[in-house]
Amino acid sequence: MIMVGSASEPYPKEEEELLLMRRSLEVIDRFEFGVSLRTKSIRLLRDLDVLENIQRKTRCVVEVMLTTADEALSARLEPAESTVAERRQLLKALRDAGIPTVVTLGPVLPYLTDSLENLQALLADCVDAKVYGVLLNGFGVTLRAGASAYFFSCLRELSPELPEAYEALLPPGKVGKTASFLSPNAAALAELFGTSTAACGLVTDPEELFAFRHAFQDRRSGQQLSLFDLYDL
């Protein structure tokens, strides 16, 4: 399996003209590798035909990242990314194409995306799209020391009260240092996440999800070759 998108978005706006991702997928398809993609972008659907070819021969898994069910908030938090509606469309299109999906929820931003209503809405989208599982790395956000100034400036743009509210989540002496901001709703969110995913049959174990995304499958092994398989006709 070839992993794509673990460090950066494989479908930025420039991909519309450059077609680098499509050409890469065509090479993966030609040499019959499997692929596991992580994205936030509906632009992936442009290459759905290639992904379907890969899925027929080997294995294709797509991991879609969801942050909020609120369109207005999504536009402010991720202005360069696909909208909430577009990500729903992406998940449903992959479902209809028979391509398995996993969803990563997050980051969970205190006072922004940490409401029970938001989590319920996102999980409902996952159930509707028949995703295999949901990965959630905690009920808060970790901030490295070097990123604190920029992060807090962004919080201030969203609401002047947010920086002070975030500082109140930290123990004394941790402001400006690497720290985790745990949502005040963490306990309630954890309970809702656990009961809802169990009731819906969504896999949440990180190791199982890792194995699912990385497992290669040769769907054509054992097939009888024909004379025409030997030639590029």
Task: Spell out what each predicted region is.
Residues 1-166:
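Conserved AdoMet/S-adenosylmethionine-binding subsite of the radical SAM
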Residues 117-233:
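Auxiliary Fe-S-binding modules of radical SAM enzymes
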